[in-house]
Amino acid sequence: MNAYQNKNITIIGLGKTGLSCVDYLLSQQANIRVIDTRKKPTGIDKLPQNIPLHTGSLNQEWLLESDMIVISPGLAVKTPEIQTALKAGVEVIGDIELFCRAATKPIVGITGSNGKSTVTTLVYEMAKAAGVKVGMGGNIGIPALSLLNEDCELYVLELSSFQLETTYSLKAAAATVLNVTEDHMDRYMDLEDYRQAKLRIYHNAEVGVLNNEDKLTFGEGENQARQTVSFAENSADYWLKTENGKQYLMVKDEVILPCEEVTLVGRHNYMNILAATALAQAVGINLDSIRTALRHFKGLDHRFQLVHQANGIRWINDSKATNVGSTVAALAGLYIEGKLHLLLGGDGKGADFSELAELINQPHIICYCFGRDGVQLAKFSSQSYLFETMEQAIEFLRPTLQSGDMVLLSPACASLDQFASFEKRGEEFTHLAQYSA
């Protein structure tokens, strides 16, 4: 008899992740109920008809009758109904915990405020180039539980702080917290509360890959890996060498690749490459395979992506910059011949925007602010314009563009005040950029 057979388990949240929990727990012969606080949740048409479903609110009676609750990462454990269930002795976990209990192959775990998806995909491509049967999922692509149905020798998981809050059995072969900057301050008490959720990835990890430029990423207490390696621009195991005007990606004294041979550009991307290389080497991927993957990797959509170039003007879609730290990373070390037309705005999730002030208060940077927190953002630039929508901002700036200029959507905010997702925001920007031709 398995651990879940005949257990009363309530799954909170439908969508792809919730449905993966349903499929997995049905295969384990559990008694399942599903709750979704939305009245018409996505995925409702894919739920087997014999599964009891409650929508529109949290059903406290169902929660208290459960042996276990599998909670969506989108719902805080601090929610009163969940706290009541916990106090009554009900176990509360997430889908990643279910996965970790079942997985028998090594796991690479990646978290951080920014760069998670790029690093996760890089490690996946490096493993593939080495001929490893590798599965990628978690907070990117397919739900982690769906990977159990695949023939994998290695799992590469992107993990959010929300997912890590309800994960207890992760024993990563290699893990990293790429960086810690303010994000989701509408859910966490403060930056330290958010950081502690991230650091859980190091609990029982074999190798921790540390960002030597960000001490907030260092493990502490029980959340420390058994061994550590580091990455940074200088003074680290994986580092960036500058010689005769050229930059090189290095591991100790060995050249990984000259930066000019990789398609990703920008200092923040070089740091992502170093972190990914460290993780890949920690699980036995050889440098030749790593080099092959790096030469072919084109980057991900909506991450500092060149979507249009004409008349000497570049349009860059960085819609995935949903927090201040991501926009700071995009702006750091950015060289522009002409003016930078920076599009900022959306839902700031309670973040402090003041870190942007020094970076954006430059003679060559003009800010175009929009969305829910556009007014707040506009205060930090002496050259700012305020609009209701991104489209209005672009139509305003379009006639002013000259050769050498860059239009950069790096909003420092989430998109949900005006768009269905950051992807939809990026797609609209791309459409408007290409319309300018």
UniProtKB/Swiss-Prot annotation:
Q: Which reaction does it catalyse?
A: UDP-N-acetyl-alpha-D-muramoyl-L-alanine + D-glutamate + ATP = UDP-N-acetyl-alpha-D-muramoyl-L-alanyl-D-glutamate + ADP + phosphate + H(+)
Which family does the record assign?
Belongs to the MurCDEF family.
The residues that the entry says bind ATP are: 112-118
The pathway to which it is assigned is: Cell wall biogenesis; peptidoglycan biosynthesis
Molecular function per GO: ATP binding; UDP-N-acetylmuramoylalanine-D-glutamate ligase activity
- Keyword Endoplasmic reticulum tagged: no
**Which superkingdom is the protein from?**
Bacteria
Q: Which gene encodes it?
A: murD
Question: Per the UniProt entry, what species is this protein from, by scientific name?
Answer: Haemophilus influenzae (strain 86-028NP)
Q: Which UniProt keywords apply?
A: ATP-binding, Cell cycle, Cell division, Cell shape, Cell wall biogenesis/degradation, Cytoplasm, Ligase, Nucleotide-binding, Peptidoglycan synthesis
Q: Which cysteines are joined by disulfide bonds?
A: none
Q: What is the lineage of its organism?
A: Bacteria, Pseudomonadati, Pseudomonadota, Gammaproteobacteria, Pasteurellales
Entry's localization field: Cytoplasm
The EC number(s) given in the record are 6.3.2.9
Tell me the protein's name: UDP-N-acetylmuramoylalanine--D-glutamate ligase
Q: Name one Pfam family in it.
A: MurD-like_N
